[in-house]
Amino acid sequence: GLMEMDDLKFSYVDNSIYDLFARSRWISPIFFSDTYRSAFEIADYSNRTFYNGKLVIATDDSKLKTPPGLKPGIHWTEIESTIRAAGGGGCFSLEEVATVYDIIEDLLIKKTYSGTIGIIAPFRNQATRLQDRIFGGDIPQEKLLHAELHVDTAHGFQGDERDLIIFSLCSGGEMPRGSLGFIRNKTNLFNVAVSR
């Protein structure tokens, strides 16, 4: 039968363990206000957008491993692409997959970037296509291993971090409505993606 309304609070789809305990009258949440993880521009974005200015940004940007020729922060690459529907409400973009591969190849082969790299996509189908392309391509496996290259959705990156994150948004005007709704309604996952 259908779950009782009271049981819905235990649904991992809608609530994290933190959410469940934070609503308990016996437990007081603790907010870790200092952040050392991201460049100022990224941490400031998360602070203003998700934390109402409560974060203390304590990152030493001089210790961040940035690719040659770039400064720490958010960099945007616009890609003309077709967003295709995938099963389960997700979507994918073959053009984004190709562009991300080219970026990784440029970083690891031409620029010999020595930091760790993560690639995050909001949709499982896009993450799988990215992983298959990158690990099945011409980039030497030892370079991918040295970069600790990890491709996943935001769920797979919670609690993890990399020196450099590439976020394959897989978004556009013709994206499926369900996918657009997912991005709009899961802002916490967007925060995970940009703050790793």
Predicted regions and their residues:
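Conserved helicase motor core of SF1/SF2 NTP-dependent helicases
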Residues: G1-R196
